[in-house]
């Protein structure tokens, strides 16, 4: 109950910020980037951290046993519907947080298909290359350069004073949830994983601004944020099956 109350209070504070930010005097570029990297993004993803016990639906265990299915997908679909409703009502703030909730739930549902930690490691090693290709040569590049409205729909926003915003693609949010959930499921270091992924995202934003590029792939930073804080544990877990044989 304490965690749920904290989540609702934080959500209310974020909604209040998103409402007020456009009416506050604008910041310089670097002040805006630092605000996003070290305040807005961590605080927004703190919602995911507070909701983390829901990754395996244990809080709804009796319902799950009766209905014989997980509730991640139905709940995620409900949030998608809410996001569409808020969008139709021209209330992007509501749509923004519904997208964050929906993709987080889908990420935790996706995690249930990973039967071994090695699968998670493999994904963490592969997706940075896929994301890099997509951002620099593939569909993400085409969407961000020629279809800004599509990217807006398929991303979450972090609003700064003056009304400007940085955006993070929904696949990035999904894998943030996957790796955070995996750190709990496989007995790794959830807190350090959470902090590591936030550092990876923050550095990605700072480097993109410093190098004056339109955008950098976010998944390399997220993957490293998962792999590096857990490197010794991951190595031990991978060696254990070999030693048993």
What are these regions (language model features)?
Residues 1-245:
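A membrane-topology feature that recognizes alpha-helical transmembrane segments
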